[in-house]
Amino acid sequence: MKKKNVVVFGGGTGLSVLLRGLKTFPVSITAIVTVADDGGSSGRLRKELDIPPPGDVRNVLVALSEVEPLLEQLFQHRFENGNGLSGHSLGNLLLAGMTSITGDFARGISEMSKVLNVRGKVLPASNRSIILHGEMEDGTIVTGESSIPKAGKKIKRVFLTPKDTKPLREGLEAIRKADVIVIGPGSLYTSVLPNLLVPGICEAIKQSTARKVYICNVMTQNGETDGYTASDHLQAIMDHCGVGIVDDILVHGEPISDTVKAKYAKEKAEPVIVDEHKLKALGVGTISDYFVLEQDDVLRHNASKVSEAILEGKPRTSSSIQ
């Protein structure tokens, strides 16, 4: 039986968690990773070396790598002191070095993938740095991925500059050949949408015959999705990309423990309400189950259970967009 081709879009911790589960299945993975990050070590390297931010890519490489734990630990090591080194992750520096050697960010990732024995392919959403801007409901424009959630305003839309940003040809080819396309999980406006907004990506996904699944976040995110239901998350993606971008939405449809809710409430986050009637009205199928793991009062998607549901390929509901 031929391996399924799975293309996954995202960034941040959520994507890495999913990929660790997905790589245990007999699938061919292409991860397309956001390059809008402008904070921390990534932001500094981006500014000083004029390269796309390596942090999200680093986490994805580690998630898909098959190396000794010590090498993984080394790649993720963050310096705590040292003039100029403090705060930097060794993996970010190695990716910056490989980009310098090869003269190309995507090629640098490809070479680093060999070093880390990566299972699958890791591609940046674009081969150049992109700047994410948020237009707020009151009309103000906030520039920079890390600044948008701090603005304390309701987000109307996000957009990228430069406007002539291009996707990688390899990425478009992977979308064309995909059997399953997965969007998320991750911060809606600052991890998920920056990938989709690279010109040509939304169109390629909509034209693809693959099953398109959006993995909805389990909790809202302060400064980004306050008060959002599952349909609000999906509506935001459709507002930016149009109809036909998602066939099925995967949601955690069970209650969350009071202790976990209390911990997240301190960060002004609350469980995302699954409003199935509105999801149906948007024309998508709903995959609902107990999809999370609670560890130390922190929620993470149960990667193997989520992967199984995505790959199951059960028939789309009659209401889904074809």
Curated annotation (Swiss-Prot):
Source superkingdom: Bacteria
Q: Which Pfam families match?
A: CofD
Named from the GO MF annotations, one term is:
LPPG:FO 2-phospho-L-lactate transferase activity
What are the alphabetically sorted keywords of the record? Cytoplasm, NAD
- Where does this protein reside within or beyond the cell? Cytoplasm
Name the residues that bind NAD(+). 13, 217-219, 263-267, 300-301
Return the InterPro entries for the record. CofD, CofD-like_dom_sf, Gluconeogen_factor
User: Does the keyword ATP-binding feature in the UniProt annotation?
Assistant: no
Per the record, the GO terms for biological process are: regulation of cell shape
Major localisation: cytoplasm
Cellular component (GO) terms are: cytoplasm
This chain's protein is named Gluconeogenesis factor
Source species of the chain = Halalkalibacterium halodurans (strain ATCC BAA-125 / DSM 18197 / FERM 7344 / JCM 9153 / C-125)
Upper classification of the source organism reads: Bacteria, Bacillati, Bacillota, Bacilli, Bacillales
